[in-house]
Curated annotation (Swiss-Prot):
Amino-acid positions noted as binding a bacteriochlorophyll in the UniProt annotation, renumbered to this chain: H13, H31
Listed GO biological process terms: photosynthesis, light reaction
Compartment(s): Cell inner membrane
Native organism taxonomy: Bacteria, Pseudomonadati, Pseudomonadota, Alphaproteobacteria, Hyphomicrobiales
PROSITE patterns: ANTENNA_COMP_BETA
Organism: Rhodoblastus acidophilus
Domain of life assignment: Bacteria
Pfam families linked to this entry: LHC
Alphabetically ordered keywords of this record: Antenna complex, Bacteriochlorophyll, Cell inner membrane, Cell membrane, Chlorophyll, Chromophore, Light-harvesting polypeptide, Magnesium, Membrane, Metal-binding, Transmembrane, Transmembrane helix
Function: Antenna complexes are light-harvesting systems, which transfer the excitation energy to the reaction centers.
Membrane topology: Single-pass type II membrane protein
Protein name (record): Light-harvesting protein B-800/820 beta chain
GO molecular function term, any single one: electron transporter, transferring electrons within the cyclic electron transport pathway of photosynthesis activity
């Protein structure tokens, strides 16, 4: 495997962080909807 330069590594890291944020937002919305639309934990 070729070694990433620091610039490439930073770019890759940004994509990973963005993907994680998107996933967390979607998960949070899904949990919120599940909480409000079902008797779950009421």
């Amino acid at each position: 495997a070729e070694v990433l330069t620091s610039e490439q590594a930073e770019e890759l890291h940004k994509h990973v962080i963005d993907g994680t944020r998107v996933f967390l937002v979607i998960a949070a919305i899904a949990h919120f909807l599940a909480f409000t639309l079902t008797p779950w934990l009421h």
